[in-house]
Amino acid sequence: MKIRCLILLCLALILINYDSHAGKPADQEEVHGLHLVHGRRTMKIPFELRSNLIIVPVRINKSEVLRFILDTGVGPTILTDAAIAQKLGMKSIRTMKIDGIGKGEAIPADITIGNRLTMGAMQSLKHNIVVLDSDILRLSELVGTSIHGIFGYEVFNKFVVTIDFQRQLLTLTVPKKYEYSAKQGDRFPIVIEKTKPYLEGITVVNNDTELPIRVVLDTGAGHALMLNTTTNNVQLPQKVMKAQLGVGLGGVINGHIGRIPKVRIGEYELTDVLTTFPDSNAFGMKIATNAPQREGNLGGEFLRRFKVTFNYDAGYVVLKPNKKRFYDKFEHDMSGMDVRAKGMNFRQYYVEHILEGSPAHFAGLQENDELLFINNQSVEDLEMAELNRILQQKEGKEMRLVIRRNGRLVLANFALKRMI
């Protein structure tokens, strides 16, 4: 269930190349681009961490507080709810097509100009925002709370950004006022290409072979590691399972899930890392010929094990291990069902997909079943993250479900199984 959310963002927007300040003089960007109000040098703002995604409070023009995902993998600011743009009277100057990963066609979107965007003490007075014509991503259903949009590069390019996953605190600092010290962690060089941060100092050990790779550091992907088998030397592990990895702007993303025995960054080493491998038809075939070379990306399930500081201006990232989370096991759903959250408060859970040969499959669960109770607990009392944890607790753990199917109550029982 979790992987659908985990891989979605790193793939869905990978082909967007749009400069929200294109054509603006440098001095005008200083006035109207992202900045901290009242000459502040730094600001802190709490964030929510859901499904390993960073969710921050944002306002557009005179809107109520909106929830945006902070995503290093996306270039422009994207509003996924066209109804909000219409309500706010956002001015569209032209339409565009967004090509995504998957089997579908390009998605229409509008480019709006002259917007005021604020996040705490950060603001932009004339901000360009891309508005999707339809909510094809369905991010709210995946995360289990209202999600209204995504942004990233414009923030990371303007400030030194420190993400404290343990305290769920985001710090923005004006680059000229930021000073690095060794106690903040180890520095690793990154290169910014086409709005994305690339890290080269990483090694994976797979099938008894050490392989240096180049990856995107992607805070908008909830998974741990994604590898692209269409590039040289990247191979599937000996044990993998086929899976529907997610749904991007272009449709369904299929592939495999496996484990990489070791992933090493400098002196830091993590083992048995859960890794996704998108099919070449869904991933490699759609990468533009002039796209920067890479073997994959590191997402939130990996990054949350560190306190992370991105310094695009100086060209490095700082990693400091989170002692409480660094050695957490990488676990995948053990039920075999993907679930979507719906309803007013996103506390109604429906089965979206059943993995063939999984415990849920053998127990007779079907797509569109509504979960009502799990082990005598009403699912209305559970957030999506809590439900995810229940379904990946422990191999052999018995699950007793009450579901609604076509207006009838149905009982289903199965034991969790570690399928990968």
Residue locations for each model-derived region?
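Bacterial N-terminal signal peptides that target proteins for export
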Residues: 1-7
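Pepsin/retropepsin-fold aspartyl endopeptidases
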Residues: 5, 18-420
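Bacterial N-terminal signal peptides
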Residues: 7-14
